[in-house]
A protein has these predicted regions:
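PLP-dependent enzyme catalytic core of the Aspartate aminotransferase-like
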Residues: 35, 49, 53, 197-234
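N-terminal "arm"/small-domain region of PLP-dependent enzymes with the aminotransferase-like
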Residues: 1-27, 193-195, 199-200
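Glycine-rich phosphate-binding/catalytic subdomain of phosphoryl-transfer
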Residues: 45, 49, 53-55, 59-68, ...
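Active-site PLP attachment segment
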Residues: 68-150
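Structural signature of PLP-dependent enzymes
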Residues: 129-171, 187-189
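General beta-strand structural signal in soluble alpha/beta enzymes
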Residues: 1-2, 56-60, 82, 99-102, ...
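Conserved N-terminal alpha-helix of the aminotransferase class I/II PLP-enzyme fold
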Residues: 16-66
């Protein structure tokens, strides 16, 4: 249930994204130099498809830098993208001028993508001068992230509410569930004890109270049996 803030939401193995990562490294393309001749990078195309609109992207090595860059351009229209989050529909996520997303690539914890509405930027391209601390990704990592986003687009068409609510009889005693995301009902002062209790039950939840746990896709309902039979009191 700890899925690295959504980076491992498609699984910890990485699948075809890690295969491409390995293949590019094997070809010796290990630097951050330009390895493809195209007006728009494949990663930018993938992000635009995911968000259903043309986007200009920048990468950052911290959540803080990405958020500050978004706010410097669009202080009232910067938001966070989480797949399968009902909040996306409420705020019409595809109309947000600046969106921050974490690519669904496990073990890449220090990469954050800021996706800016292309039309809004073209209206005033000088806005980009306000961006600070953007980084250039090594090509192999960029390829892997591109594949992970396409894998997410595919998964968005396959995973539905029915894949998560089957665990509600156990989980909703301790969390409020929004899609696959679990926000703790357990008071913050009791959260560390609760996390340790879950470990005793063979379950790894988010160690950070402010970072939601995530319902594991396709998990056997039996994995929560120990928690069901040994409830945590708070």
């Amino acid at each position: 249930m700890y899925q690295e803030a959504g980076r491992a939401i498609l699984g910890w193995e990485g699948g075809s994204a890690f295969t491409l990562f390995k293949n590019v490294l094997s070809r010796g393309q290990t630097g951050s130099f330009i390895c493809e001749e195209a007006p728009v990078s494949r990663l930018q195309k993938a992000v635009s498809e995911l968000l259903a609109g043309d986007r200009i992207i920048f990468c950052f090595s911290s959540h803080k830098d990405a958020f500050e860059a978004g706010l410097s351009l669009f202080p009232d229209e910067t938001s966070f993208y989480r797949p399968w989050n009902a909040q996306n529909e409420k705020i019409k996520i595809n109309r947000q001028a600046a969106l921050i997303l974490t690519p669904p690539l496990p073990w890449a914890e220090n990469i954050f993508i800021l996706a800016l509405d292309t039309k809004r930027i073209e209206e005033n391209p000088d806005k980009l001068l306000f961006i600070r601390n953007a980084i250039k990704l090594p090509f192999a990592l960029e390829v892997a992230m591109t594949r992970s986003i396409y894998n997410l687009i595919k998964a968005l068409q396959e995973r539905q509410e029915k894949d998560w609510f089957i665990y509600d009889p156990v989980l909703t005693k301790y969390w409020n569930r929004e899609g696959p995301y679990l926000f703790p009902k357990v008071p913050k002062d009791n959260y560390t004890d609760f996390a340790l209790h879950c470990l005793d039950c063979g379950i790894v939840i988010s160690p950070d109270y402010n970072q939601p746990s995530i319902v594991p896709f396709g998990a056997d309902r039996g994995v929560f049996t120990k928690l069901k039979n040994s409830p945590f009191e708070y």
